[in-house]
A protein has these predicted regions:
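Core beta-strand elements of the Rossmann-like FAD/NAD(P) dinucleotide-binding domain
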Residues: 31-35, 183-192
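Glycine/threonine-rich phosphate-binding loop and adjacent beta-strand/alpha-helix elements that clamp
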Residues: 192, 196-239
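A conserved short coil-to-beta-strand element within the FAD-binding core of flavoproteins
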Residues: 26-29, 144-145, 159, 163-183
Length: 239
């Protein structure tokens, strides 16, 4: 599922004269130190690598189409005092585990409104750490938690407090030989562009060719959605 890259349908990608690559096929031969770097896409991939490259690049511009919910990972290491407490009170370990299960089970089903409200509150509290009001507003989601794939990070929002990091929300018109032209007429010049645009996860059999009678393609037959009798049999194809 996560091996078929998606490249955005933006005109001019091949016209760019600098380095460019997909985040899932990272080009380690490209030295990003002191470079001007543009990142298209700010979801699950970007929140992982953007904080890692921000300290080394000269300028990092992230192009965002839709603001996502980015909430704390809640993955802090246990302190020595906490470890001593759990050793002395093993019954508390089970209570903690049960509470963790309850929260994550509610999160996965998106049915516990109280849990969802707490998560949104935690996300907004972390977002409030972004000092620039305009950037903070651009990063604020306009949809409830769970409508899009939720993201978990403790280090993404802090990069926007760096002087060399900017968030661009104007739509992209095209890629140019020098960089990215946005719909407001501004050309953003870069040395390297990273496409953090995800994977093809919704097309059936996108990495596998199944042929039926007379050379028919199962991928074409299922282009508008997969259908099979009892979930196992499709007319005209091997079953």
């Amino acid at each position: 599922m996560f091996n078929n890259l998606v490249w955005p349908k933006i005109p001019g990608i091949a016209d760019f004269k600098g380095n460019y690559f997909h985040s899932a096929r990272w080009d380690h031969a490209v030295d990003l130190n002191d470079q001007r770097v543009g990142v298209i896409g700010v979801a699950a991939s970007a929140i992982q690598f953007a904080p890692a490259i921000a300290p080394k690049v000269r300028q990092l511009s992230l192009f965002q189409r839709t603001a996502n919910w980015v909430v704390p990972k809640a993955n802090e290491p246990y302190s020595a005092a906490q470890l001593d407490f759990y050793r002395a009170h093993p019954e508390e370990v089970k209570k903690s585990r049960d509470e963790t299960y309850r929260v994550w089970n509610s999160l996965c089903t998106f049915q516990d409104k109280a849990v969802l409200a707490d998560i949104e509150r935690a996300g907004l509290e972390r977002l409030a750490e972004v000092r620039d009001e305009q950037t903070r507003r651009k990063l604020t989601p306009n949809h409830p938690f769970g409508c899009r794939r939720p993201l978990f990070s403790d280090v993404y929002y802090p990069i926007f407090n760096r002087d060399n990091v900017s968030l661009v929300t104007d739509g992209i018109e095209r890629v140019t030989p020098k960089g990215i032209l946005t719909r407001d007429g501004v050309e953003h010049e870069f040395d390297t562009i990273v496409y953090s645009t995800g994977f093809e996860t919704t097309t059936y059999l996108n990495a596998l060719e199944v042929s039926g009678r007379h050379g028919a393609s199962l991928r074409d037959a299922w282009r508008d959605g997969a259908q099979a009798y009892l979930g196992i049999t499709t007319a005209g194809f091997p079953n």
